[in-house]
């Protein structure tokens, strides 16, 4: 009698989370996107023949939510009967099932919910937190508020949010930059640095909206604020520009979150 547990069912669902206040980053000020008013989630729940289950999710902002759900729905049935331990094999199977629409972007974002659900299932069945299942090293990590200051918020509002984050034990603050007036960006960064002091980690995020010349100029002007990193100063696919910028500045450059495939990350690295 076989003891191999197989996938019996994949349940997909979607939900919209409306934001209390629309939020804006630099893409709004360049006219490339509208303010974000909601986040759309894709949930995947995988159940096995022996009754084990795992839950995963992915999400989209501004656009793509219905497409993620549709893509996942179209390919998910293909993993029924597979061994849930074969996570890499299953991911490759799903990737090729929808390869005609590409192996990045919406396609891989849709698969993320299923992939995460498989890892969740494996950890639950082992009776371990996922971190330990993967081979844990630390028992704590330093956190930061990635939404510390969108551009629709006033400087006073950003300061208040920073104070709240620090009081709650969050170890760093990231704020948005990329306003049409770069002097206003610098004023806001200076105001936050003065408010939180020199020792609290501070980062900025331009959301891909600077060109190379602007990124270099702003990067040099921002160095006095001892930033942990400057995030997405350039278009995510400008790999060469990021490399030149990283060599020219003392402040580290962070990027990569908009890349959704192994090939794209290989190109960046």
Predicted feature locations:
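Metal- or metallocofactor-binding catalytic centers and their adjacent structured scaffolds
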Residues: 9, 47-125
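Conserved, mostly hydrophobic/aromatic
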Residues: 7, 51, 75, 114, ...
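Active-site mouth loops of central-metabolism enzymes
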Residues: 141-157, 177, 206-211, 254
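N-terminal small/glycine-rich loop or linker at the start of catalytic domains
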Residues: 129-151, 195-199, 247-249
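Catalytic domains of carbohydrate-active enzymes, especially glycoside hydrolases
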Residues: 164-176
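Flexible, glycine/charged-enriched surface loops at secondary-structure junctions
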Residues: 87, 130-133, 229-236
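Structured beta-strand/loop patches that form or line metal/cofactor-binding pockets in enzymes
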Residues: 2-50, 55-60
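Catalytic core of soluble alpha/beta enzymes
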Residues: 175-269
